[in-house]
Amino acid sequence: MWAARTASAWGDAFATVALGLLVWDRTGSGLGVAGVIVAEIVPVLLLAPFAGVAVDWFSPVRVMVVADLARVLVAAGLPLVAGSVPGIYAVAFAMSAASALFNPAASAALPALVNEEELIAGNSGIWTAAVLSQIVLAPAAGAVVATVGYGLAFWVNAASFAVSALLLSRLHLLRPAADAARAAWWHQARDGIRVLAGHRVLRALAAGQALAALSAGATSALLVVLIRERLGRGPAGYGIALACIGVGAAAGPLLLTRLITDPRKPAFIFGPYLLRAAVDAVLASVRVPVVALGSLAGYGGGTSAGAVTFNSLLQAETPPAARGRVFAAFDLIWQLGRLASLGLGGWLADAAGITAVYAAGAALLVAAALIGRAGLTDHRHHQEKRR
């Protein structure tokens, strides 16, 4: 599993850089690049409920292999339509559709491979490999595009999916009996929502996910605006900012595995939200580049550590037979919040300035931490009363 996810992350590093550069080259506008983001979000909104059903109905490994093989074909075909902007958007849409299947399947597979005490370490290993791949290979991808062209970068991505599919095909998981497998797909999707809504911990996590997405969608997308307008730095400054986030994101899980193995500690689940809120508040109030860049390293660490503990708790608490549907629902919540945040953040930046965007982002993250922690505390008290 780790080797397959790492191989896929290598290809993603090349594809992310190459796709952004390709769209900018063909359109020459930020709106054109934003179109790719929309093309990547829409498939998740359309397919997530049914993708979750597929994961619960079939083996997660089988779903991942099929998704990877689909991504091989799509990624390999991208150079053929590289001259057409609609063609590029169509490929981005198809890649995201396959990922809408792969991601909940991958989340469902890990808790079937390791026990609960190993979830933190397992998620940390996967996350760290992905972040390090981005840090190391993103500059290499830019160099490949500059010297060889776009085609090689996308073929590297296709090859990475082929390697991932080959490695995953050797995994064999025991699949829990799906008691809803004989029901209609829509009924199964609806039952997954009922599982989420009826579980105190999952509700708390969903509320935190929604508020965090409303914050992160805008602050991440508009970081380049903050670097340019508030800190007065150009492309090099933006690159350094991303590097600072990457260093923090790589260090976060490594530190986390030394501190805890229990994924149910609220301080390590929702505490990272408060850390990220503090960073957003700093970015909204300071103009000193060194301070801002240093805080971004903390943001990266909080994001990665929070993602690991959040996903580990989600995997530990979700009933095995409903994992695919619940994880797909969380993907849907994230993308809906991200899409809303992009629109609202752009409007707020134009109306009140970039500082207001980061101040609002900080407030949303504080709310996410407080609401999420309250939900977990309520669950714990409920369990104690039942005893």
Residues covered by each model-derived region:
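Alpha-helical transmembrane-bundle signature of multi-pass membrane transport and export proteins
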Residues: 1-387
